[in-house]
A protein has these predicted regions:
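Solvent-exposed loop/turn segments at secondary-structure junctions
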Residues: 68, 82, 147-149, 170-173
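Short, surface-exposed loop or secondary-structure junction motifs
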Residues: 1-141
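Short, loop-centered acidic/histidine patches that primarily coordinate divalent metals
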Residues: 124, 144-146, 159, 168-169
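Glycine-centered structural positions embedded in regular secondary structure
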Residues: 118-120, 145, 163, 180
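Short, well-ordered beta-strand elements
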Residues: 151-170
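Beta-strand-rich C-terminal secretin pore/gate domain
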Residues: 141-142, 149
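Short, gly/Ser/Thr-rich active-site loops of penicillin-recognizing serine hydrolases
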Residues: 110-115, 126, 134-136, 166-194
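Short acidic/glycine-enriched loop/turn segments that link adjacent beta-strands
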Residues: 22-23, 148-150
Length: 194
């Protein structure tokens, strides 16, 4: 991932914490009761796990479906590569066919008309508070992240070519909706909705 995606796109980040500059990390907090506590696990080195690492088997130690340490700006560049079906600024990362396959549901989480999972990406059904984006053919695509107090989302509309990237930490749950959904809708309503 680091060589074939991150470096090719000119981004800074990766799954292996020991290969990154800790001075560039944001402090991540969890909310515990009435206070915020700095997360101890967010940037824990996995070096002690490496002697027993088996390619293709031990990969969960790096959180391969997420777990990448990256800035919001660089995550937006990565999202734009997916929005352009595998290409960004003339740099092809994956074939258009593979990119479209990644954005096509292959696993039914619930039933038709509810969120569906593709290959590391998913359709967001009933997520955006705009009836248009709750209609088949208009569902936004993306990925959320949540661990150690971090909450992030990259979500875009293949139909209308808009996208949102957001990262927060130490949130308090909002009654009735997931925090990221509320944040995404606030950004959508302020910046995208006509």
């Amino acid at each position: 991932v680091r060589e074939n995606v991150i470096h090719k796109l000119g981004l800074y980040g990766g799954h292996n914490i020991d290969s990154l500059d800790a001075g560039k990390f944001a402090r991540i907090y969890n909310r515990r009761g009435e206070e915020y506590v700095e997360s101890e696990g967010a940037y824990r080195s996995r070096s002690e796990d490496m002697p027993n690492y088996v390619f293709g088997y031990s990969s969960p130690i790096f959180s391969p479906t997420g777990g990448v340490k990256i800035s919001a700006h660089d995550l937006a560049v990565y999202m734009m590569m997916h929005m352009n079906y595998g290409e960004y600024n003339g740099i092809r990362i994956i074939s258009e066919e593979s990119a479209k396959t990644m954005q096509t549901p292959v696993w039914m989480i619930q039933k038709e008309g509810e969120e569906q999972y593709a290959l590391c990406l998913r359709e967001f059904v009933d997520y955006i508070d705009d009836e248009k984006y709750n209609t088949p053919g208009y569902y936004p695509i993306g990925h959320t992240g949540g661990a150690y107090g971090l909450n992030s989302i990259m979500i875009w509309s293949p139909a209308d070519n808009w996208g949102i990237v957001a990262m927060t930490n130490g949130f308090t749950a909002v009654k009735g909706k997931v925090f990221l959904q509320c944040l995404t809708n606030a950004i959508y309503n302020a910046c995208i909705k006509e």
